């Protein structure tokens, strides 16, 4: 039986490389404010140098090769709509992100050749990237449907009802 895959944020470019390997098992992919990258580009190719250097240094200092969670970035860029209580709870779930995810160029040719339906679940209050950036990344891969939801980058956590309604709509397209 086929599955519907949902990828959020940096999982977008992870899925770009993984999905072609299991394309026969996937009915649809829903990207949620996900980084969808051109072939042979990494997420860091789209991040300002001053931010990259801070992230790389933090990963070195962590001793794990992972970028530690920046509470201020989460609060003001990812979970900008969360109450203080929700923000504190979210912080208990988040984990460091391996630097390699940010630095590895995506091999996206096989992804471009896939014939799997795609939908963007687009969180319209996301301020983690410039306005329209995630929409532009998605539309670069074709004229696929977009479902807008009125929430921030962490909408699944900060506005679960609104997010779930949008997700169900995306599933049913």
Language model segments and positions:
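Conserved loop-alpha-helix segment in the C-terminal half of the alpha/beta-hydrolase fold
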Residues: 124-157, 169-170
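Active-site nucleophile elbow and catalytic-triad environment of alpha/beta-hydrolase enzymes
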Residues: 89-111
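Helix-loop "lid/cap" segments that line or gate small-molecule binding pockets
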Residues: 69-81
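Flexible "cap/lid" loop of the alpha/beta hydrolase fold
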Residues: 20-26, 30-67, 100-107, 130
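Short beta-strand/loop motif that positions the catalytic acidic residue
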Residues: 114, 120-122
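Conserved alpha/beta-hydrolase "nucleophile elbow" surrounding the catalytic nucleophile
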Residues: 3-9, 123
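Short, amphipathic alpha-helical "lid/cap" segments that border enzyme active or binding sites
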Residues: 160-168
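Glycine-rich nucleophile elbow surrounding the catalytic serine of serine-hydrolase chemistry
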Residues: 7-17
């Amino acid at each position: 039986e086929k599955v519907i895959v949902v990828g959020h944020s940096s999982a977008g470019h992870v899925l770009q490389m993984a999905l072609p390997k299991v394309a026969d098992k996937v009915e649809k992919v829903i990207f949620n404010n996900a980084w969808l990258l051109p072939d042979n580009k990494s997420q860091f190719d789209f991040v300002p140098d001053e931010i990259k250097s801070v992230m790389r240094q933090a990963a070195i200092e962590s001793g794990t090769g992972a970028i530690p969670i920046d509470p201020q970035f989460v609060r003001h860029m990812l979970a900008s709509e969360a109450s203080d209580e929700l923000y504190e709870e979210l912080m208990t779930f988040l984990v460091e992100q391996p630097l390699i995810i940010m630095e590895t160029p995506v091999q996206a040719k096989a992804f471009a050749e896939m014939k799997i339906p795609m939908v963007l679940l687009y969180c319209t209050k996301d301020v983690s990237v410039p306005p329209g950036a995630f929409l532009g990344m998605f539309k670069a891969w074709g004229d696929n449907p977009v479902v807008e939801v009125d929430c921030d980058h962490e909408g699944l956590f900060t506005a679960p009802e609104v997010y779930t309604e949008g997700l169900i709509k995306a599933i049913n397209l």
